[in-house]
């Protein structure tokens, strides 16, 4: 039977291939018993984080580590979204909120993470073995997760830096505007702000968008 020492070495070898992160299930499968895990955590050699384990323990985890932790904890059907997914795809925003999408009817709980559960289609990008929401979807998930003032600032920044155009926005939000959808009211308000900024073309696009979503109480050019 393999010794605990060699099992620990194998876990640490696996962690190097997974951006410093291993799941508790992986640790158990390799053969490290719970008592040894507790000892390694208590001595600071390993560190518990987001329901998984950081190996070796570090004070901070980079975006790729966060994404790995979320994927291992939430399963292969989940998507890493929000600011983490944006930064990993080259869009540099400062917010450190952790956001992930999980399919219905799964109901995981994970402290410190905004979990989105819906049946909306999202584009998927695979980067370094991880499933990330494509930039436009990660941006929309961020917009509905942060505070209202932050969402306005983020949208302004995205348009100014040409991370997306007004047309990109309208194309992406139409499936999210149905009544009862998470964040739909906020997305409608932000769509109005874009329409007002782009004048008649934007207002016409916005009107079509709202009609398609069954929203009939909006009036263009209303003052």
Residue ranges and their predicted role:
Residues 1-185, 201-202, 207-209, 219:
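Short gly/ser-rich loop at a beta-strand->alpha-helix junction or flexible surface loop bordering the NTP-binding
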Residues 182-194:
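A short, surface-exposed helix-loop junction/capping segment
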Residues 191-205:
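A short, highly charged nucleic-acid-interacting micro-segment common to nuclease
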Residues 212:
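Conserved adenosyl
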Residues 216-223:
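Short, intrinsically disordered, charge-balanced linker/junction segments flanking boundaries
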């Amino acid at each position: 039977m393999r010794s605990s020492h060699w099992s620990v070495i194998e876990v640490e070898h696996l962690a190097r291939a997974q951006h410093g992160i291993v799941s508790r299930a992986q640790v158990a499968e390799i053969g490290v018993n719970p008592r040894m895990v507790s000892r390694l955590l208590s001595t600071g050699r390993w560190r518990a984080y987001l329901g998984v384990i950081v190996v070796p323990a570090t004070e901070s985890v980079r975006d790729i580590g966060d994404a790995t932790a979320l994927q291992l904890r939430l399963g292969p059907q989940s998507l890493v979204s929000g600011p983490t997914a944006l930064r990993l795809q080259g869009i540099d925003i400062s917010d450190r909120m952790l956001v992930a999408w999980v399919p219905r009817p799964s109901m995981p709980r994970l402290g410190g993470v905004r979990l989105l559960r819906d049946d909306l289609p999202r584009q998927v990008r695979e980067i370094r073995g991880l499933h990330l929401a494509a930039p436009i979807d990660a941006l929309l998930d961020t917009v509905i997760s942060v505070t209202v003032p932050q969402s306005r600032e983020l949208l302004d920044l995205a348009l100014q830096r040409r991370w997306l155009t007004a047309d990109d926005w309208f194309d992406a939000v139409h499936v999210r505007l149905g009544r009862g959808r998470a964040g739909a009211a906020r997305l409608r308000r932000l769509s109005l702000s874009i329409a007002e900024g782009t004048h008649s073309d934007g207002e016409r696009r916005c009107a079509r968008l709202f009609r398609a979503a069954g929203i009939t109480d909006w009036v263009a050019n209303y003052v």
